[in-house]
């Protein structure tokens, strides 16, 4: 009897040996074509979850496959290591963020290595390491020197009790601080921005080049950039030199403007508010300041506003119109002001009704009568201009351009393209982030830290209270420095950078991770970039992927790198979902373990709440701790081994689809690997693995192959062909595994009449196809077959077309179009021969006897149909 499959022992053995061999190191120089396989790097939370396992397994299979296909492969890993959780740990547990993060990295690195990932760990990066963020700061200064980094006032989430800025994720659904419970306010602070809007058009247009990206992701980015073509118009304020600027995509409606609205935060709010309205306006501004952006712009929420008492002039018709402030207008969007055209915009229509504002119709349908217009809803379609001075009677689409020209000729405004995309606010009032390398001098302004003084390192002597300003803002010894320009006393910038900055260039660092002189060498970037296959979740479709594209374009324009797009192909893997139990009455989630009481297991088809006895809803949902539906990868690895976990992840669903965790299917993959183990060890014929078979280098033999051998070779090369097609572009791992299962079944079913060379070819083919998927098992069996080199260094298999040629085929016999049965005929038979073979077959004779054949229809390789009378 063969030795049993001991996954844990085998996996530990080969992980150690691969590390000793340096099997996964990136080739330093090679004439082979390159392939850069990359997974989005993780935040080091301390433990892998199944989403991680899926992401990194997918990329690993691709990397292993490409090595076997003759590519030099770069497959690195690192850590997106700055962020709020480490700072929270410091507050809650008294653990310094650096210590907490490094411990988590070590733990997760070990877990990744247990998965058997073929990662070049010599290129590992951690964004919190000074030798990494030194170069993040260097790149920031490149943006600063290019005029792409600047400061301006911006609203932030402000905790009035803790006196600190909060990230969006620290504000709960009721608008309260996660820590103090206070209602969060909106407050203006001076913040750092990157001018991503300068690249809006390039980011939008170059989406067309990304043919290897999912259309869904490109559409999401296009919508996020949000290009609008329209007009910039200015409305003078009565009795003032100031003007209110608005952007509109409907300049054809300008004669229908009956009011203008400012964002409450707009600087002109103070200018236009009259003494009579000051109290009302102040009260409204204070109320809106407590609301989040999401609350203010929610579609289902009534739009609230108040009059300021100020008056604007519509320059097109000279009419005086009221100026209001409203919660739905945001200062950060566009100009921070909008023109109100209630007759032709539904939101304006409702707002005008609620605030008793007038309406003026200026466009009517082509077939409408202007004498009797009674609006019940806004008319938002194209039509004929009315009540619009010299533009009356003109078709509204044509009037758009005419009105823009009129505005330009009279200095009322101009044509303008606007984007929904806003400049990237990168300031964070946090400690655990990359320090912004700027020194503020009263005389010189914002002065960049000299390159020789980088990195500006995070100080260690920090107290974390969770209250007040950023911990860095309290360290006077760290803050107070001489100005690099004039030498006078100055102060360091105490904000740190958004962690998305760190992840916007890490893929460039992997190309040259040990460089101490530059963030990367341009020639090495030219060799490895763009990333050939990027793998990560759809949740990063906009921010991370857009910011990475932005960084790449800026660095290309700075002539630091030769590529303008970072990722050639993108695979967004689906979520891993767990079975979830929920009480529909209380909304409470119930852990699966609670469905068992003592030895009595509750019927899984009709589960009840163990507390109330109510029926539970059962469905699949993304794994999370709060829903009690997660599966710990470490438990799966301990029970089944990494190869089984990998196989299940790859087999259960196509990579871009959501995957429903199923213990029974995990068992199924474990059984399959056991079957492969027994198949090969039985073939070797020695349970101790002492007597090894010798691999023949050729199938040439003096004897012709038997039918059974030909059938097996056809199955072997059919599997090679199908797996190659499954892994060609779309990486359909699940169907590739199905083909391997078919081949294993063919090998198991093969009779003793199969010769040694043919069976050996089948065994080796199965192992080579399976190697990228189950690397440990296949390596062990490969060596038990007598090989001394790694299976992962073997060339990918090529199809032998002659093996796929059929000697015989099955031919369908039909009479009057009805199938009567099948016969076996030579595959080489032509139409005449097929007709003769069919006509003379016993099967056909039974139906043709005594009949007159009027016509014979022959479809070569498929059927013969007799038309009789």
Curated annotation (Swiss-Prot):
The chemistry this enzyme catalyses reads: tRNA(Leu) + L-leucine + ATP = L-leucyl-tRNA(Leu) + AMP + diphosphate
Positions of short motif 'KMSKS' region: 622-626
Task: Cite the GO molecular-function annotations of the record.
Answer: aminoacyl-tRNA deacylase activity; ATP binding; leucine-tRNA ligase activity
- Cite the entry's keywords alphabetically: Aminoacyl-tRNA synthetase, ATP-binding, Cytoplasm, Ligase, Nucleotide-binding, Protein biosynthesis
Task: Kindly list the GO CC terms recorded for this protein.
Answer: cytosol
Which subcellular locations apply to this protein?
Answer: Cytoplasm
EC annotation?
A: 6.1.1.4
Q: Write out the residue ranges of the motif 'HIGH' region.
A: 42-52
Q: What is its main location?
A: cytoplasm
> Which residues are connected by disulfide bridges in this protein?
none
Sites binding ATP sit at 625
One Pfam family of this chain: tRNA-synt_1g
Q: Which domain of life is it from?
A: Bacteria
Record-linked CDD domains: Anticodon_Ia_Leu_BEm, LeuRS_core
The record's Gene3D superfamilies line, in alphabetical order, gives:
HUPs (3.40.50.620), Isoleucyl-tRNA Synthetase, Domain 1 (1.10.730.10)
The processes (GO biological process) annotated in the record are: leucyl-tRNA aminoacylation
| Annotated PANTHER family | LEUCINE--TRNA LIGASE, MITOCHONDRIAL (PTHR43740:SF2), LEUCYL-TRNA SYNTHETASE (PTHR43740)
Provide the family line. Belongs to the class-I aminoacyl-tRNA synthetase family.
**Which protein are we looking at?**
Leucine--tRNA ligase
Q: What organism does the record attribute this protein to?
A: Synechocystis sp. (strain ATCC 27184 / PCC 6803 / Kazusa)
